[in-house]
From Swiss-Prot:
Gene3D superfamilies listed in its UniProt record: Dihydrofolate Reductase, subunit A
Keywords: NADP, Oxidoreductase, Riboflavin biosynthesis
Protein's name in the database: 2,5-diamino-6-ribosylamino-4(3H)-pyrimidinone 5'-phosphate reductase
Organism of origin: Debaryomyces hansenii (strain ATCC 36239 / CBS 767 / BCRC 21394 / JCM 1990 / NBRC 0083 / IGC 2968)
E.C. numbers: 1.1.1.302
Oligomeric form and interacting partners: Homodimer.
């Protein structure tokens, strides 16, 4: 399905929250769609439509401004996402951000995924798959990634109980690999972690759909108080979009 045209008012609205150069780590944008009751899915592992096609175009526009798109293993197993960018710039160029999959224990069979097909068809880049240094990836996945110029990135993710420390390790390594900006899209555990770590997140962009998903839904909420500054709102055909920075 082709994207709707980008609503013109979104460009100036988003501008100050898009990546700018950072000296020693990637610029990190946390962005996701949620219901009015702060749920991102109706049930664990269930793909749930929340946002309008208008803000789907916005998501691809934001992707076009980043070097990488990060999701966790839960999102990958539930949604089998394509993680490419389909927004076409005015000059006809389509950006190719690098998919980044956080999969510490090596659960994902990449060679069977939609993303593998996307890369085979030259419609996106092969992923960097972040695994713990003790994990041995599947031979099939290694072979496919080698051909597509993707990679398994081994990091000490499981031995470190300090989640902030883990994120610093991840961001430092990705910066060394040439990823200067990252759009983090989920899932819930990653979102909930990062909402607490204000020094890691540079911009927060939340799409809010006019729906309640109920108490059985997958909730996103920080474990403690998290304040926002530089807050701006945008109202679309159906959805509201919040842009802000964490204090």
């Amino acid at each position: 399905m082709s994207l709707l045209p980008l609503t013109p008012s979104l460009r100036p609205f988003l501008e100050e929250y898009l990546p700018r150069p950072c000296s020693n780590r990637p610029f990190v944008t946390l962005t996701y769609a949620q219901s009015l009751d702060s749920r991102i899915a109706a049930k664990p592992g269930e793909q749930t439509k929340i946002s309008h096609l208008e803000t789907k175009t916005m998501t691809h526009y934001i992707r076009s401004k980043h070097d990488g798109i990060m999701v966790g293993i839960g999102t990958v197993l539930a949604d089998d996402p394509k993680l490419n960018c389909r927004f076409e710039a005015e000059d006809g160029n389509i950006s190719t951000p690098r998919p980044i999959i956080l999969d510490p224990t090596g659960k994902w069979a990449y060679h069977k995924s939609q993303l593998r097909s996307v890369c085979d068809n030259n419609k996106g880049l092969a992923p960097f798959i972040l695994i713990d240094e003790t994990v041995t990836p599947r031979n099939e996945d290694v072979e496919v990634l080698d051909k597509q110029d993707g990679a398994f990135v081994r990091l000490p993710l499981l031995r470190n109980a300090d989640k902030v420390g883990n994120w610093n390790i991840i961001l430092k390594k990705l910066f060394q690999l040439g990823i200067k900006s990252i759009m983090v899209e989920g899932g819930a555990s990653i979102i909930n972690d990062l909402l607490v770590y204000s020094k890691i997140i540079d911009s927060l962009i939340i799409t809010i759909g006019p729906v309640f998903l109920g108490k059985d839904g997958v909730e996103v909420s920080p474990s403690g108080h998290a304040g926002l500054i530089d807050v701006k709102w945008w109202q679309g055909i159906q959805d509201s979009v919040l842009c802000a920075r964490l204090t």
